[in-house]
Regions:
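Conserved N-terminal entry element of GNAT/NAT acetyltransferase domains
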Residues: 1-7
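Short hydrophobic/aromatic beta-strand or adjacent loop that forms the aromatic wall/cage
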Residues: 10-13, 132-137
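Core beta-strand residues in small-molecule sensory/regulatory alpha/beta domains
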Residues: 15-17
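Conserved acyl-donor/pantetheine-binding loop and adjacent beta-alpha core of acyl/acetyltransferases
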Residues: 19-66
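Short loop/turn segments at strand-loop or loop-helix junctions that form parts
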Residues: 27-28, 66-68, 103-107, 113
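Conserved GNAT acetyl-CoA-binding A-motif
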Residues: 61, 90-111
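Conserved acetyl-CoA-binding loop-helix of GNAT-fold acetyltransferases
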Residues: 69, 75-90
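Conserved active-site alpha-helix within GNAT-family acetyltransferase domains
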Residues: 106-130
Length: 140
């Protein structure tokens, strides 16, 4: 599997391919200002509480907004490989100890938010807040 970067956005969009076949992607938002991210999360998540995230170095970090696998490729083991490649990419661009924030949230009925959080925890993410309807906020 390979990835390509879309330079036409402020976010980093990784596209994953198996040969010429598009498998899915990842959306990574650089965190220039931690307070801006906290405001953004507060606006989009009803019961978000940013106090715990304030303990982490957010400025200069990254917000992993989404990793997705195209519907026809789900269940073929691509997600784990895409997550590993995404984390390798993030680790290359963040070397100053800044944090990576994500939301373990699934719209796929075959994988729960808790299962996603379990997978992310294998990569060093810790749970900060389990929201009612908007997934689990995690940080590394």
């Amino acid at each position: 599997m390979t990835n390509e970067i879309d330079d036409n956005t402020n976010d980093v969009i990784l596209g994953f391919f198996d040969g010429d076949e598009y498998i899915g992607g990842a959306d990574i938002e650089p965190i220039r200002y931690g307070e801006k991210l906290l405001d953004e999360l507060n606006d989009s998540i009803d019961d978000f509480d940013g106090r715990a995230l304030r303990r982490y170095k957010l400025d200069g970090g990254a917000y992993l907004q989404d990793i997705w696998v195209e519907r026809k490729h789900r269940g073929n083991g691509y997600f784990s490989e895409m997550l590993k490649m995404t984390m390798d990419f993030i680790n290359e661009i963040i070397s100053d100890g800044s944090s990576v924030v994500l939301r373990a949230y699934s719209e796929n009925s075959n994988i729960t938010d808790d299962k996603l959080a379990e997978i992310y925890s294998r990569y060093g993410f810790v749970e900060i807040q389990d929201t009612d309807d908007d997934g689990i906020i995690m940080v590394k």
